Every structure is written in structure tokens, then in C-alpha cells.
UniProtKB/Swiss-Prot annotation:
The lineage of its organism: Bacteria, Pseudomonadati, Pseudomonadota, Betaproteobacteria, Burkholderiales. This is Small ribosomal subunit protein uS5. It comes from Ralstonia pickettii (strain 12J). With S4 and S12 plays an important role in translational accuracy. Located at the back of the 30S subunit body where it stabilizes the conformation of the head with respect to the body. Residues 17-80 form the S5 DRBM domain. HAMAP family: Ribosomal_uS5_B. One of its GO terms (cellular component) is small ribosomal subunit. Keywords: Ribonucleoprotein, Ribosomal protein, RNA-binding, rRNA-binding. One of its GO terms (biological process) is translation.
Length: 172
């Protein structure tokens, strides 16, 4: 198995992506000879224009785990349709016991979101949004619930195509 070298200072990629680390957990594997310590990292990567990806990485050292998570997040990026720095419409995302409600907001509102959700919207480029989380506050489940809700969001063009109308009729 190939070893991934930890990222050293100044070894920044010039791909224009924003990276945020959400959580690092210390994990322990108990074996016959004692305990083996490791680390698990949860990160999000975005381009500031609606693309977002989540990654998890595990390793014996924190920098290696974070780098693995960042690489996975880059590979799993999805495009979310934004409208003037906010969402198209209200959406609800669920994962496990975590339920996340996201509502578009007017200019000047800012990002009203807690914990892991704030990191997602900052790297994604959302500037005005109001969110509320219900149930589980586990960072992994909150991130997955947020991404679930963002994947459910549809553009006015998609809604118009489903209804057999023009975009102007949908927007009123």
C-alpha cells in the first residue's frame, strides 16, 4: 500500500479551491499487545461558486489523515445551483438522526449557520442563508444531511421542464 506524504507548509495546490477541516477524532484500536492510536479527519472543499465536496480520511498521524480527507473531498465534488449567493428555494436534508433545514436569505443577512454547516457554506460561496439543525449534532451526520438537502435543490429551469411550462411562468 502506498504511503501518502504529509503536506508541508508552502505545498499549497494552485487549483483555486477553498478547504476547511471540520473535525479530527482520535480513534483507538485495541489489539492483543495494547492500543493502536489513529486519527480520523472530516473536511470539505469548495470552489466558492457552488461546487462542494466532503471527504473523510484515516491515518496514524493527523496531517496524513487531513490530506487523505482533502483528496477524497476533491474527487467527490458536486455542483449546487446558487442564486445571487443564496439558495434557489428552501430545502430539508436528512441523514440518520440529523435533520437540516436551509432557507434562502436576502442580501445582508450573512451566513446564519452553526458548526459544520457554516464551513460548508463558506467554502461553497454562499453569502446569505439561514439554517436550522434538528436532532443529531454529530458533525459527520450534519455534513451528510446538508449535502443531501443541497442535492435535492432544483433550478427554475428544471421545475419548468417537469411542469411543461416556461421559466418565466414559473418565476411569475
Amino acid at each position: 500500500m502506498a504511503k501518502i506524504q504529509p503536506k508541508v507548509q508552502g505545498d499549497e495546490r494552485d487549483d483555486g479551491l477553498r478547504e476547511k477541516m471540520i473535525a479530527v477524532n482520535r480513534v483507538t484500536k485495541v489489539v492483543k499487545g495494547g492500543r493502536i492510536l489513529g486519527f480520523a479527519a472530516l473536511t470539505v472543499v469548495g470552489d466558492g461558486d457552488g461546487r462542494i465536496g466532503m471527504g473523510k480520511g484515516k491515518a496514524k498521524e493527523v496531517p496524513v489523515a487531513v490530506q487523505k480527507a482533502m483528496d477524497e473531498a476533491r474527487r467527490k465534488m458536486v455542483k449546487v445551483p446558487l442564486k445571487n449567493g443564496t439558495l434557489q428555494h428552501e430545502v430539508v436534508g436528512k441523514h440518520g438522526a440529523a435533520k437540516v433545514q436551509m432557507m434562502p436569505a436576502k442580501d445582508g443577512t450573512g451566513v446564519i449557520a452553526g458548526g459544520p454547516m457554516r464551513a460548508i457554506f463558506e467554502v461553497m460561496g454562499v453569502t446569505n442563508i439561514v439554517t436550522k439543525s434538528h436532532g443529531s449534532t454529530n458533525p459527520y451526520n450534519m455534513v451528510r444531511a446538508t449535502l443531501d438537502g443541497l442535492r435535492k435543490m432544483s433550478t427554475p429551469a428544471e421545475v419548468a421542464a417537469k411542469r411543461g411550462k416556461s421559466v418565466e411562468e414559473i418565476l411569475g
